[in-house]
Amino acid sequence: MTLAAAAQLEKTPLETYVPPAKPSLIGLSRAELAERLGHIGVAPAQRKMRAQQLWNWMYLRGARDFSEMTNVSKEMRAQLSDHFTVDRPEVVAEQISNDGTRKWLLRLPSGDDVQKAHEVECVYIPETDRGTLCVSSQVGCTLNCSFCHTGTQRLVRNLTAGEIIGQVMVARDRLNDWVDRETPNGNRLVTNIVMMGMGEPLYNFEAVRDALLIVTDNEGIGISRRRVTLSTSGVVPNIIRTGEEIGVMLAISLHAVRDELRDELVPLNRKYPLKELLQACRDYPGASNARRITFEYVMLKGVNDSLDDARRLVQLLKGIPAKINLIPFNPWPGSAYECSDWDQIEKFSEYIFNAGYSSPVRTPRGRDILAACGQLKSETEKLSVRERDALRAMAMTD
């Protein structure tokens, strides 16, 4: 990344970050909203009704300020404003790819030192029949997958439920995609959610669960569970919990068919090897031909792309209602891998298809803004110390 490109990404220096003075209500359940209302003196008999009003304004209509909540009394609005906000994460920068993909860099409180801030990225991918939002669950990642750019950034902290749902709300804000606002043909622009951004969702299970329950609530964000996919590298103990407590579609970052290679590509495999992972998939609640598990397989030249690998993959998935997404490797600075040749990807896909599995090849999106699969990483983490210092100096004079 050039210094000029970095300056476009981040105009506000980290030194000027001001932590929020009041807590945001974003990310709270109805019961938690009622509890907070009790803290400011709302009578017990009114809490449930008032909590439902807040819920509808925040998650259905996308209110950005209590003053917008016209069916709430002026006195109550003032009281809410004195104690709380409905703020989302701060949008530091937006990049738009040549193919229409959008990437937002979002700034969050650090969670410990209130004078510092952290960043995450989320990505919106428009298609003719859907609009998919790729959401992050952690600042950084702990898994160190060798082919993944995010894996080169250390894990900083888990996101809260509010910070996860806040990414969805930011996207709807930026796309003008709320119920009361105009969208093309009256349709929503964000139709699908994939937990495939920064971090391992199942190492932040409770916050991810709470956020996705808001996403899939018919009186909230209102996206069907069948349009929400959670991707995991294989945190086996929480796979069954995902089906039981969240009920969304499951995707597995597989990428190898032999434990020895997967140990290298996805080090989590040393803790939860293929046999345990695939058994958890066979036991996943609700899995069927109508609700197939997606297996993601990044195509690495000369590493995992042989026809023998394809044969082993078909054997491994026997008995699992599955589809296989083949992902051309997206290069990033410093990577040791190359993408498989296109002819080899097609041969691999054809073998799997002839064995009875859907095997689409994922079209890379947003490569020019490092928004494609495996490319996400907080921008301030990417910069060298020298570039970061220069960027801050420029921002201070803007």
From Swiss-Prot:
InterPro entries: Aldolase_TIM, Methyltransferase_A, RlmN_N, RNA_MTrfase_RlmN, rRNA_lsu_MTrfase_RlmN/Cfr, rSAM. The active site is at E121 (proton acceptor), C373 (s-methylcysteine intermediate). Binds 1 [4Fe-4S] cluster. The cluster is coordinated with 3 cysteines and an exchangeable S-adenosyl-L-methionine. This is Dual-specificity RNA methyltransferase RlmN. The gene is rlmN. SUPFAM superfamilies: Radical SAM enzymes. Residues 127-370 form the Radical SAM core domain. CDD domains: Radical_SAM.
